[in-house]
UniProtKB/Swiss-Prot annotation:
This is Tryptophan--tRNA ligase. It comes from Pyrococcus horikoshii (strain ATCC 700860 / DSM 12428 / JCM 9974 / NBRC 100139 / OT-3). The lineage of its organism: Archaea, Methanobacteriati, Methanobacteriota, Thermococci, Thermococcales. InterPro entries: aa-tRNA-synth_I_CS, aa-tRNA-synth_Ic, Rossmann-like_a/b/a_fold, Trp-tRNA-ligase, Tryptophan-tRNA-ligase_arc. A motif ('HIGH' region) lies at residues 82-90. Disulfide bonds: none annotated. Keywords: Aminoacyl-tRNA synthetase, ATP-binding, Cytoplasm, Ligase, Nucleotide-binding, Protein biosynthesis. It holds the Pfam family tRNA-synt_1b. Signal peptide: none annotated. Transmembrane segments: none annotated. PROSITE patterns: AA_TRNA_LIGASE_I.
Amino acid sequence: MVEEFKVTPWEVEGVVDYDKLIKHFGTSPLTEDLLEKTAELTKSELPIFFRRKFFFSHRDYDLILKDYEEGRGFFLYTGRGPSGPMHIGHIIPFFATKWLQEKFGVNLYIQITDDEKFLFKENLTFDDTKRWAYDNILDIIAVGFDPDKTFIFQNSEFTKIYEMAIPIAKKINFSMAKAVFGFTEQSKIGMIFFPAIQIAPTFFERKRCLIPAAIDQDPYWRLQRDFAESLGYYKTAALHSKFVPSLTSLSGKMSASKPETAIYLTDSPEDVEKKVWKFTLTGGRPTLKEQREKGGEPEKCVVFKWLEIFFEEDDKKLKERYYACKNGELTCGECKRYLISKIQEFLKEHQRRRKKAEKLVEKFKYTGKLAQEMWNEAIPEPLKRS
């Protein structure tokens, strides 16, 4: 990986240069033309995730739009590895996925990889990851997906995924997996097999698959694109998001393993206030006098970055806040108070919906229209013949 930063499916370190990452991964920039086409086809104003380039890169998104425009359609696939409670950084890509499902009217498959987290996390038992799976599913349902067009499945329960993974695994030799994921002689054999399971949902339909996810997950889809057509399927398409920074730094990404750096979806208003006041990195000057004279540096400020990514919907207000900071008209305390109120407002509504989600788990996993189809469907013929 490029020397200044590191991005893999398991860790992100340093301040990421996203332009360099596009070149390194061989993806394409998400251009204004593609965003305008998205707005045209959906007849909608773009959400802030697209307007502000939080999603910045893609593979074959142009072909997704072409398929939709010409009536072939597509489907969505994303997922969650249940290793602990979900935080703000985990949930934001799900809101982007919800917008895509809503506006394009397509099916969505959400894979809960309780098996992966057991294999990759030494400190977790399989019972732990299954328990976290249920907890995380409540947060995902609270986003507001269509229960008849969304199938949420746990790998440990939906064993059909294993039958699909076997022919996929036959297409991937160890050299390929090692080159993409950096496996070594110390890697558990379950870890080496797991990419086949994560790739399997890209073959759930004979349409092109679109995966909205953070760019650290791209290696899985690069591997799928190497052999998908030999199985009679499309190469999967992807939309890549940037990382949500932790409260304490603009480098790396928010981590559940460092509680002080993250806002969890179950945090209380008091938790939010305490964390933002105590831990959040700002772009302020050492003294109020300097702040007034020289102005702040919003480009170095986590508070501003969080408002930009998710918590300030109004573009005009965000721009005004940027220049008020640059001109020394705003103090860091004022911005922190504003962010605290925005986070508290979001979490209050999310937690209300999360409580209601308890009654919807069965529908998303087993009894909804798409869920029933998936439990009753046979393994696709091209995979059977492989």
